[in-house]
Amino acid sequence: MRGFVYVLVCVLALASFSRAQLPGAGGPVLPGGGPTIGPVNPDPTRTEVCAKFWVQEGNSCYLFDSGAFLRQVAASRPVVVNNQDGLFQAAANMYCGQMHPNASLVTVNSLEENNFLYEWAVRMMIEPEPVWIGLHAGPTGQWQWYSGEPVTYTNWERMTPPIAEPGLGAMIFDADIIAQMFNNQVEITPQWVPEQAINDRHALICEYHPSGMTAAAAAPTNAPTFPPMTTAPPMAATTRGPVMFQNNPRNLVNSLTGGRFGGSLLHEIPRRQRMRPSNYRKNPYFGIQP
């Protein structure tokens, strides 16, 4: 019995020691997982307008972040990624405030700003990555920005804006496989998609306005809030087979060597969260297309 008590005391002491090594130990833990990260200290010698790791565009500074916290379990252990899937939306907004005192999840005020974020972030992606923006369902049943700025511009994927149901937030860079002439084309859309803000973890874009700068006002326009469609040049008619989806890549490997899918490539398909069963959201899916 004494041996059991001794082991239990040692385990508790080790757990307490390990907890003390975490960055921000003793502080609140973000809902998306990972330890609290302290605010960024301003560098008085820095001559750039934006803080380190941030990029300036217009009157704003932006930070694209995976939301993957680095965590050291103990002083003698290496630093590991604690939350590789990103953060819940509210936790992502808290994280932005820790990266800079005046920052929040990005507020998108115009089509030009939306297009900049799209081109800037997608160029850094190896694979499509859904990203939280600051629009979320407020307590009054209306869409609102975490920055507190008025909602003067939206860019929803569907023509009819979604209802601001409790618990919803907006993400950008949704992706899905599309039928194209060439194999395995993946479309990353600059339109916004409603997501469960407390159930889905994503990367994030933060924004703040440097001292003396304010948010650029959206120019009044009656044009649609999505990029115009471009017309592809005429192409010869061709027969295109269907996309084949499976949640186990081994079931698809044999299809790559012959038949209609011969010569195709196998890709993991980004998981669009809405209107999909829970088992689809939790497990990766794979697809091939001739």
From Swiss-Prot:
Tissue spec. comment: Accumulates exclusively in mineralized tissues.
Gene Ontology molecular-function annotations: carbohydrate binding; pattern recognition receptor activity
GO CC field: external side of plasma membrane
The protein's name in its UniProt record: 30 kDa spicule matrix protein
All residue ranges annotated as the C-type lectin domain in the record: 92-162
Entry-linked InterPro entries: C-type_lectin-like, C-type_lectin-like/link_sf, CTDL_fold, DC-SIGN_domain-containing
Residues that carry a glycan: 102
Gene3D superfamilies recorded: Mannose-Binding Protein A, subunit A
Role played: Matrix protein of the sea urchin embryo spicule. The function of the matrix proteins is to direct crystal growth in certain orientations and inhibit growth in others.
Signal sequence annotation: 1-15
GO BP, one annotated term: immune response
Alphabetical list of PROSITE patterns matching this protein: C_TYPE_LECTIN_2 (PS50041)
Keywords: Glycoprotein, Signal
